[in-house]
A protein has these predicted regions:
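Alpha-solenoid helical repeat architecture
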Residues: 2-4, 43
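WD40 beta-propeller repeat blades
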Residues: 8-12
Length: 203
């Protein structure tokens, strides 16, 4: 599948960034635009099909690869975040991340939103919420992965992080208000997720 192929390519790029940064350096300017496009387009799809999925979307069959592993947007998001982690951990590539910090944080917070599935599960069992949200939890999710990446960025770029995070939070709060005032059922039912994710990002 297209998602599976993108995931495999991102995993390969991550290995190259970590192990042969000198060889990758001349190619980074060509690699980053399609990776960024994948991150942004996948965010729209993830929010629509996972975060705000309706009951009808629950019937979609899972796609598996040749190894029997489920190939989904979650796996693609994990691969994107691992690639960004690799850039942050490699001194040669950190300036590339720093340059687009505010926009990157905006999309990370999008991925931090509670999904309908999580909301239903946690409403029925509050103890499960406490367990899943614990930093030592064995339940790894896009929400937790997003928090991990945001923490890594703030630790690496302390000074820039404050301004970028403030801009990100304000942007999400503004868009949440616009959603709530949109007059649509989807907007009214989902705008709170933006606000919750923004508050979560503040820690």
């Amino acid at each position: 599948t297209d998602t599976g192929l993108k995931t495999a390519i991102l995993k390969a790029l991550t290995i190259l960034v970590k192990n042969v940064p000198k060889i990758m350096s001349p190619w980074l300017s060509q690699v980053l635009p399609p990776v960024w496009a994948t991150l942004t387009s996948s965010a729209d799809t993830y929010v629509r099909e996972v975060v705000n999925a309706g009951d009808a979307d629950d019937d979609h069959e899972e796609v598996v690869d040749s190894d029997g592993e489920v190939v989904g947007f979650e796996n693609l998001v994990f691969a994107i975040f691992e690639f960004v982690h690799a850039l942050v951990e490699t001194p040669k590539f950190r300036p590339s991340v720093k340059q687009g910090l505010a926009d990157l944080m905006y999309y990370i917070v999008l991925y931090m939103q509670i999904t309908n599935d999580q909301c239903e599960k946690w409403t029925e069992n509050p103890d499960q919420f406490v367990e899943d949200e614990d930093e030592d939890s064995f339940t790894y999710s896009v929400r937790i992965s997003s928090q991990d990446l945001l923490t890594a960025l703030c630790e690496e770029f302390e000074e820039e992080c404050c301004v970028s995070l403030a801009q990100t939070i304000q942007r999400h709060l503004n868009e949440s208000s616009e959603l709530a005032a949109s007059g649509t059922i989807v907007g009214a039912e989902t705008s709170w997720k933006r606000r919750e994710a923004a508050m979560l990002a503040l820690g």
